[in-house]
Amino acid sequence: MKKIVGALAVFVITYALFSAAGYLFPVDQEWYNSLKKPDWTPSGTAIGIIWAILFALISLSAAIVYAAFSFKGAKSFWFTLLINYVLNQAFSYFQFTQKNLLAASLDCLLVAITAIVLLIIAKKYSRAASYLLLPYFLWSAFATFLSFTINSMNL
């Protein structure tokens, strides 16, 4: 029972932390809407739904690793997740607070790289935890391409 409660707490805390950027660095809709974007840019609503799902998958992956190995038994997973988390939050800061599209794009690339590293590391602890991170990596790779495209269209 203690592991289940701990895993549930890890899920909730991870989800809340990954969701924090939306509150810490709110989107300046007027500025964002003024940017030139490719026709294949998802709507803001779609992006919000996708991130909500991805945050749940990341959180579930973390909860699975925690339930099986706690924090001490999976240090490489937690360290990589922490780095990825900071980079994930930094994207919103660069994009929406600093309005620096190049910095946001470079940061997004680092998010994608750390997402694939996290996926690989997670596989050492749990295949399920690893597979849950695949959509996050794929979306991060797409977001990187989109971010660099938006940056180039607005030079």
UniProtKB/Swiss-Prot annotation:
Bilayer topology term: Multi-pass membrane protein
Any one GO cellular component localisation term in the record: membrane
Which keywords does this chain's UniProt record carry?
A: Cell membrane, Membrane, Transmembrane, Transmembrane helix
Q: Name one Pfam family in it.
A: TspO_MBR
Signal peptide start and end residues: none
Task: Give the similarity note.
Answer: Belongs to the TspO/BZRP family.
Q: What is this protein's record name?
A: Uncharacterized membrane protein YtaB
Q: Which gene underlies this protein? A: ytaB
